[in-house]
């Protein structure tokens, strides 16, 4: 019985640290140096949630979000936010020049969904770290050469920086 109690204590102490994301700009699974430089710049164009945008690669913007309860997202977020007191929004992107792998990188924490041809696009890889000014998360998606929507949810602030870059 003492052994089981000891195991329970060890799990209680160890599991929370295993679930934490790494800290530092060198902890991402792939280099985000260019995206970080872009997101920490002061001249990012600003767009409102719901905007349609065209893009040369890399595409970068600050998105003005709305309270999540007011966000008109094309599909329900794949993951429910931890709190309904967060922000969300979406932008519609013109078709990329060619199909391929694209990274969507955020300046702060938030959930990213991509919708293309009316369907959710599953991510192929993701990386995140805390303690890196300007960059918090990056997710890769295989996109067709057709328009798509990036929708964000669970964001704590009413603006977020976003970069879309090719692989």
Across the structure, where does each feature detected by a protein language model lie?
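N-terminal signal peptide c-region/cleavage motif recognized by signal peptidases
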Residues: 14-16
């Amino acid at each position: 019985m003492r052994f089981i109690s000891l195991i329970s204590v060890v799990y209680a102490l160890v599991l929370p640290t295993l679930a934490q994301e790494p800290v530092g700009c060198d902890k991402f699974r792939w280099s985000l140096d260019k995206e970080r430089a872009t997101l920490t710049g002061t001249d990012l164009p600003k767009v409102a949630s719901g905007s349609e945008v065209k893009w040369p690669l890399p595409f970068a913007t600050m998105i003005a979000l709305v309270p999540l309860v007011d966000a008109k997202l094309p599909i329900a977020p794949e993951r429910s936010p931890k709190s309904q007191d967060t922000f969300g929004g979406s932008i519609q992107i013109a078709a990329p020049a060619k199909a391929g792998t694209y990274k969507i990188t955020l300046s702060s924490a938030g959930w990213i969904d991509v919708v293309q041809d009316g369907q959710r696009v599953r991510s192929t890889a993701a990386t995140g770290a805390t303690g890196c000014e300007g960059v918090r998360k990056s997710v890769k998606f295989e996109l067709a050469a057709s328009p798509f929507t990036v929708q964000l949810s669970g964001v704590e602030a009413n603006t977020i920086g976003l970069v879309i870059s090719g692989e």
